[in-house]
Design a protein with these regions (language model features):
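Short amphipathic, basic-aromatic surface patches that mediate peripheral association
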Residues: 2-23
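Compact integral membrane and secretory-pathway proteins
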Residues: 3-6, 73, 124
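Short linear motifs at secondary-structure transitions and domain/linker junctions
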Residues: 4-7, 52-57, 107-110
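Beta-strand-rich binding-surface signature
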Residues: 7-9, 27-29, 75-77
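Short beta-strand segments enriched in hydrophobic/aromatic residues
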Residues: 14, 34, 82-84
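C2 and C2-like phospholipid-binding beta-sandwich domains
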Residues: 18-29, 47-50, 61-67, 79-138
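Tryptophan-paired
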Residues: 33-74
């Protein structure tokens, strides 16, 4: 499908922590990537460490631009993971808790996903969170 590709911005607005992976406060971080057809553009929020003292039911205002540009192909792949930090993902003693992953490929037929995607429930056996993000035309 050949079409004019718009200039887009993917903005991670909020994360509602329904249940973190720990008893009491959690230490939250987010990782993922956006691929417009030219390769994965990774991100981490915060860039290092974690967001401390996050309690169940708390909403985090993230407001981070994950990607900007004109897609190089007819696909815009958005992948966002929520994590509760413990001793690292590969720890045998107390690994980080995966709270859920959002993964979707937007196409011109979906208007590139333009609009607000609010309170998307994501969960694993270790926790649950609600993702809100927006894709905007520049």
């Amino acid at each position: 499908m050949s079409t004019d590709r718009p200039n887009l911005t993917v903005l991670f607005e909020q994360a509602g922590i329904v249940h973190g992976g720990d008893i009491g406060a959690a230490e939250i971080y987010f990782e993922g990537w956006v691929d417009d057809g030219s390769g994965k553009k990774p991100f981490r929020i915060p860039k290092s460490g974690h967001i401390p003292e996050v309690h169940d039911g708390q909403t985090l205002d993230v407001n981070a631009v994950l990607w900007q540009g004109v897609p190089a192909s007819d696909q815009l792949h958005v992948h966002i993971e929520g994590w509760d930090e413990d001793l690292g993902r590969n720890s045998k003693i107390n690994p980080d808790d995966h709270l859920g992953t959002y993964d979707h490929v937007f196409t011109p037929g979906e208007r590139w996903g333009v609009g607000r995607h609010a309170s998307i429930p994501l969960a694993t056996k270790d926790g649950e969170w609600l993702l809100t993000f927006r894709i905007e035309k520049a």
